């Protein structure tokens, strides 16, 4: 699995990591969560990303998680592994380990956080990772979390690398439009912003790497189908109702809101690991009313987020 398999994926879910109350991974909860996603239009799954609370996972835990999910998925959809850190050497070592582990269409490597590298430093970081193994690399560009932004010009330099096959772009629609217009033919562009998915797909993006697909996969699929069928009136109507739900999902540090909803739905998502904490009970109730029930009064009263949330 690689570029061709991922090209078919419109909705890639950034999978949560289910935890027990003591903070250990709840491997028994994984099968039901996976089957739920696949029943509601998830086309691919990202493991050990931000939504999985990857900063709190050891590499050994990530490998255990990979094995557990691969066993359940059994090749039904492509999988992407989170492989990047702000340490190039550590990223290289883990990318090699994941490549040897097998079963992944690609690895997702984040722009280095905290170090604040230059554009050339970021270019060399990703080039070196991509050179290190035959695992295809997708770049994760999210300046709201990492402080620095990989510019479209640097991204296009990296897009020429044969082992860099795409980007999860969380900057602006202007940057996304530029990348779509100038990218190599076999280079995937996903938005990482659920609220931007409508606009990104209309610009020509390949899909979304999503948190909302844990809970709202059906309406996302319906919206994407309407776009593909050029029914903009229907797609826009879905988007108008979808935006408040996205804002609710990011009204508290993610993935606390989506975990609260999944727990409410009967899935054992469990708590978050520190330094993240669960959403307060009253906030969680209001989030559930918006995302699950589409409660208009709850939306008016409590959900005042933005199209591109901070979290």
Swiss-Prot record:
Positions marked as site (Part of a proton relay during catalysis) = 50, 114
Under catalytic activity, the entry for this protein gives:
L-aspartate 4-semialdehyde + pyruvate = (2S,4S)-4-hydroxy-2,3,4,5-tetrahydrodipicolinate + H2O + H(+)
- A biological-process GO annotation: lysine biosynthetic process via diaminopimelate
Q: Which keywords does this Swiss-Prot/TrEMBL entry list?
A: Amino-acid biosynthesis, Cytoplasm, Diaminopimelate biosynthesis, Lyase, Lysine biosynthesis, Schiff base
Localization, per the record, is:
Cytoplasm
Lyase listed as a keyword: yes
Please tell me whether the keyword Lyase is annotated for this protein.
Answer: yes
Q: In which pathway does it act?
A: Amino-acid biosynthesis; L-lysine biosynthesis via DAP pathway; (S)-tetrahydrodipicolinate from L-aspartate: step 3/4
Family assignment?
Belongs to the DapA family.
Q: What is the protein name stated in its UniProt record? A: 4-hydroxy-tetrahydrodipicolinate synthase
Which species is this UniProt entry from?
Streptococcus pneumoniae serotype 4 (strain ATCC BAA-334 / TIGR4)
């Amino acid at each position: 699995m690689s570029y061709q398999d991922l090209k078919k994926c419109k909705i890639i879910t950034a999978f949560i990591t289910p935890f027990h109350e003591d903070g250990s991974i709840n491997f028994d909860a994984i099968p039901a969560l996976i089957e739920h996603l696949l029943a509601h239009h998830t086309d691919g799954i990202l493991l050990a990303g931000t939504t999985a609370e990857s900063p709190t996972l050891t590499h050994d835990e990530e490998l255990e998680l990979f094995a557990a999910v691969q066993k359940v998925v059994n090749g039904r959809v492509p999988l992407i592994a989170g492989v990047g850190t702000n340490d190039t050497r550590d990223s290289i070592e883990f990318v090699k380990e994941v490549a040897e582990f097998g079963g992944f269409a690609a690895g997702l490597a984040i722009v280095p956080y905290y170090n604040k590298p230059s554009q050339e430093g970021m270019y060399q970081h990703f080039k070196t990772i991509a050179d290190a193994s035959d695992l295809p690399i997708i770049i994760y560009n999210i300046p709201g979390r990492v402080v620095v932004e990989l510019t479209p010009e640097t991204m296009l330099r990296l897009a020429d690398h044969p082992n860099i096959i795409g980007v999860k772009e969380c900057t602006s629609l202007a940057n996304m439009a530029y990348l779509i217009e100038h990218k190599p033919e076999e280079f995937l562009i996903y938005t990482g912003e659920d609220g931007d998915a409508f606009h990104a797909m209309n610009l020509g993006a390949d899909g979304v790497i999503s948190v909302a697909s844990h809970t709202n996969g059906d309406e996302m699929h319906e919206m994407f189908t309407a776009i593909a069928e050029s029914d903009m009136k229907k797609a826009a109507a879905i988007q108008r109702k979808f935006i408040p739900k996205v804002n609710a999902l990011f009204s508290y540090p993610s993935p606390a809101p989506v975990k609260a909803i999944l727990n409410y739905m009967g899935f054992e998502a469990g708590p978050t690991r520190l330094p993240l904490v669960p959403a307060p009970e009253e906030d969680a109730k209001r989030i559930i009313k918006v995302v699950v029930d589409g409660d208009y009064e709850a939306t008016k009263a409590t959900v005042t987020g933005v199209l591109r949330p901070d979290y």
